[in-house]
Every structure is written in C-alpha cells, then in structure tokens.
C-alpha cells in the first residue's frame, strides 16, 4: 500500500495530522521550512512522527543553495552550480568537492533521523530560472560527472539519491509551481542532451529514485512527463532500465492542473507509472484523496521503503567526525569564493 506522501502545517504534529499519518495509504512525509525552528526542535518533531508511524519515509528538499529547508544548526550547502567555478574548472577537484558535499548534506539529515533529500538535480542549466544554479552545469558530461560524485558521497553516508526532474526541466522558462511549462524542442534535442544525466546514472546504478517534471514535451508526448506512461513506462522503465522508485512532483503545483482535481491527478500519476505521489501545502487536497480516492489494491511495485537509509553505513559515517568537520569547512570555502565574485 502506501502510495501517498504528505506534509505538516507547523512545528509539531496535530491530532488531525496524526490520524492522517496512521492511514495505510500514507507512506511518506515531506518537511518544509515551516516545520523547522532549530535542530533540537526538528529532532523532537521526527521523534514524534516516528512514534506515530515508525517506518514512514521522512524526506526534505535539501539540495543546497537556495533550496535548503533547514539552516540554523545545519551547514549551508553551496549551490551545485557553484562547485565547478569555485574549483576554477578543475574537474578532478570539483568531483572530490561534490563527493564531500553529498556526504555532508546527507549525514547532517541522517543525524536527525531524516531518511532522504530529494537530490540531486540532474537538469541542465539552461533558460529555466527555477533551476538555474540548482543544476551542476549546462553541459551533460559535467552534470554526469559531478552528480555521480555527489551521489557517491550521499551513499557513503547511507542515503539513496533521487534524480530530478526527468527528462529535464532546464530548457523551459516557465516555473511549474505556478504555470504549465511546455518544452517545444524536437525529441532529438531532449534525447541527445537533457536525458543523458538520467540515462548514464541509471546505467551506473546510482539512482534509487527519480522525480519527473511537470513539463509537457509535445514533440514527444502530449502529457506532462509525470502523467505520461510513455515517458515513465516506455522510456524510463523499459528503455533506460530504471528499477527504482518514481515519485510524482507535488500534485498541488500548477503544472499538475493538467489532470484535473486531486482525484484526477492522483489517478493520472499512478496510471502513468508513479510509485508514490506527493501532495503538499493542501490539507483539504490530502483529505479528498484519503477519503474519496480508490487506491490500487496491490502495493506499489517499487515501494518507497527502498529509499530507507543503509543503517550500517550511516552508523559508520556518524563516527567519522573529522570528515564531517572537513566537509563543513569546504562548504564555507566555496560559499566565500562565490561571495567574492559577486
């Protein structure tokens, strides 16, 4: 079961939210900045959640740069797009730094019993302002090299990686949080450029999860990728051989309105091939699904529990205080290098 990931309104779990968390179709919880006031409060919140649903997958968007939900008491992770410039184009050095930043990002979350960061971004840095420096680079080969190192650092902390936003969000100007982006390029451009980081990292077995884009690529398929069985079943599963978890992006985003109300959006996402659907910032929307949606009788073929951390690896990583401290200093060094350029 457990097809739904939801969120919380505040710094602790209300009784109504506790009831939602107990629902058998709820398998995941995503945290936001509004759920955080301090590291101590966050740890207490996670403990409260675990008392209600010990096995639930707890996730956050904690990529670095401007997308980092927890700040006070956490290291500020540089934007991924700052790594290679800070290394002055030295790819060997940049890869080593990316690995250490992946480790740092993951271990600071795992130390608070948070399972997963939806990272890294595998989009190319093109015209999309909502992506921008969240991307490692405009060049596929640089994205592949740096993302692989970042993912390997995450794995050394015990955390799996979720690549986003398949097959690529970097070449559309519209922000799918507030609009319906349409990528008018020919299929050849997408398959020869944007999809390459996903293709290569899947082939190398580096991705445990993938999040598709709420973007329409009309020269390929009329549906947004997250609602497209062609993109998810034919391309991602069959042609690229991906066997991890497919998470929908937030079904509350404007880019998801294509599929109608929440019942329609959930059905379209699951029919297309998503294993877990996200509904954020909309409690009534969550309740409409829990009370009115006809969920699949069978459990997800690729359950989100596959993204639970490697506990033995995390235990080893938590003992490595010197690596953690050195990675913090590296993050600060890259931040200072970027500030000096501005």
UniProtKB/Swiss-Prot annotation:
It comes from the Bacteria. One of its GO terms (molecular function) is beta-N-acetylhexosaminidase activity. Substrate binds at residues 61, 69, 134, 164-165. Keywords: Cell cycle, Cell division, Cell shape, Cell wall biogenesis/degradation, Cytoplasm, Glycosidase, Hydrolase, Peptidoglycan synthesis. Its EC number is 3.2.1.52. It is an enzyme of class 3 (hydrolase). Transmembrane segments: none annotated. It catalyses: Hydrolysis of terminal non-reducing N-acetyl-D-hexosamine residues in N-acetyl-beta-D-hexosaminides. It is found in: Cytoplasm. GO terms for biological process: carbohydrate metabolic process; cell division; cell wall organization; peptidoglycan biosynthetic process; peptidoglycan turnover; regulation of cell shape. Pathway: Cell wall biogenesis; peptidoglycan recycling. Belongs to the glycosyl hydrolase 3 family. NagZ subfamily. Plays a role in peptidoglycan recycling by cleaving the terminal beta-1,4-linked N-acetylglucosamine (GlcNAc) from peptide-linked peptidoglycan fragments, giving rise to free GlcNAc, anhydro-N-acetylmuramic acid and anhydro-N-acetylmuramic acid-linked peptides. This is Beta-hexosaminidase. It comes from Shewanella sp. (strain MR-4).
